[in-house]
């Protein structure tokens, strides 16, 4: 989102390569459909362009957000031991740990939009074709909506959280993410590695996709 032509060119090359691989599979799936995401969309009547876009979204959403959310939620629980204690005491669950992290740190911090017509909000007029950025990270720390917006607190109500968007733009992968992270990754990590502890500083990076760059840990082998 910084307008770097080299980054843009690299991204365009990558998406074009994915499109070529998709196009190579389409004829085969037209005669021999299967249960793949690509085939299901074709059978549902989506256009080739829509199918390509959705496949690329699934590839991106299936690696960036889970990576950041798993590493970030693990760091949050190791850093805030009193919150992890709520899970071991069974007063709260792994889904609480994941959803509160997604609110507090917002693995998807921003989503771009294009204004289709002149629009006025308060005393600000947005002209048609203007580019705007919807800030999930800001909305998820709204002091008017959350009791302790800047704290990682499993006991906090998350009814107003927009970590997965809202309305017609609600994330199609939300339930898959909850299952992958809260039912598999986090409980497995803490069960398989008892005594896991942080052993260094953790830096976060990213804007649209935000998460820890590294999470150095120590695990005492018993």
Language model segments and positions:
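Cytochrome P450
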Residues: 1-222
